[in-house]
Every structure is written in C-alpha cells, then in structure tokens.
C-alpha cells in the first residue's frame, strides 16, 4: 500500500531542512521524498509538523521500565527494588515489561534500541511486536537475576 505524507518540514540531517515536502511510503518503507505528491496514492496532510529521523538509544534495559524515576539520586531502585524482583521474573513478565519500556522509547522518538536484559528472546519478541529496531543481547548474572543454569553461557 502506498501513501504520501505531507509535512511542513522534513529534517534530513543537521544541515538539510526541507519545507512543504511529501514522504512517499510503500509497504512501510520510505520510497520517495519530493516537493509534490506522486502517483494517485492517498495524501495525508500532517499539518504544521516536522518529520525527522528517529533517535537511537545505544544502551537500554527496556525491561527495567518499572523502576524508571525511582531513586535517581541513589542506586536503591536497582538494588532494593529490581534485584529483589528479578529472580522471580519469567519470560512472559519480561515480554510485558519490555513492551512497556519500548512504548516509552517510541513515544519519545526513539526508533532503535541496543538492549540487554534477562530473557533476551523475550525482549526480541517484544521489539518485533512493537515495531522498534532492536539490537538485543543476553544478560548473564549468577546473582540477583533469574539464573537459568549453565545453558545460558552457551547461548
């Protein structure tokens, strides 16, 4: 499916700002950038907005979203709260927490994350389902987390 989105500004980089441009998207891929709508596809006028590339967060733990904002002046949120909870987490819990963390990322314009957390396959599942680009690594800890045994090391 092809659509054209019209925006007041399209910011390509720090030096190139286009005014009153159309972004053609076909099957969720940007296929054209032009100053007039192409083809007979649907035009969606976004009004007085700026469209720009998404942000990349190169160090996330999206599954830790539940302690966001707690204990910023100390590490107590991590040590006292999450390290008490994490040994009891399962993959389904991590998927749900990761989806919430990814929603937080997307709502602030972050479209790519580099994340590592327990149950990395669950984090990857959440990333795919939420539509964010993810570079996902696995966390291995013998204390405080859900240690699944030596099989974790061979992943």
Q: Which residues does each PLM region occupy?
A:
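N-terminal metal-binding scaffold of metallo-dependent hydrolase/deaminase domains
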Residues: 1-39
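Active-site beta-loop-alpha junctions enriched in small/polar residues
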Residues: 61, 118-119, 139-144
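Divalent metal-coordination and catalytic microenvironments
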Residues: 8, 23, 28, 48, ...
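Short, acidic/polar
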Residues: 92-102, 117-120, 152-153
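Hydrophobic faces of well-ordered beta-strands that scaffold small-molecule active sites
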Residues: 54-60, 113-115, 134-137
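Metal-coordinating catalytic core of metallo-dependent amide/deamination hydrolases
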Residues: 124-155
């Amino acid at each position: 499916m092809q659509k054209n989105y019209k925006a007041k500004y399209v910011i390509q980089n720090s030096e190139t700002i286009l005014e009153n441009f159309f972004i053609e998207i076909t099957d969720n891929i940007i296929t054209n950038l032009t100053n007039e709508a192409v083809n007979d596809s649907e035009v969606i006028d976004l009004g007085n907005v700026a469209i720009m590339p998404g942000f990349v967060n190169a160090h996330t733990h999206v599954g830790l979203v539940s302690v966001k904002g707690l204990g910023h002046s100390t590490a107590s949120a991590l040590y006292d709260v999450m390290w008490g909870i994490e040994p009891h987490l399962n993959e389904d819990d991590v998927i749900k927490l990761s989806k919430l963390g990814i929603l937080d990322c997307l709502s602030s314009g972050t479209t790519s994350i580099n994340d590592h957390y327990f149950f990395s396959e669950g984090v990857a599942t959440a990333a795919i389902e939420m539509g964010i680009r993810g570079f996902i690594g696995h966390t291995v800890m013998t204390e405080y987390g859900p240690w699944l045994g030596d099989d974790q090391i061979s992943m």
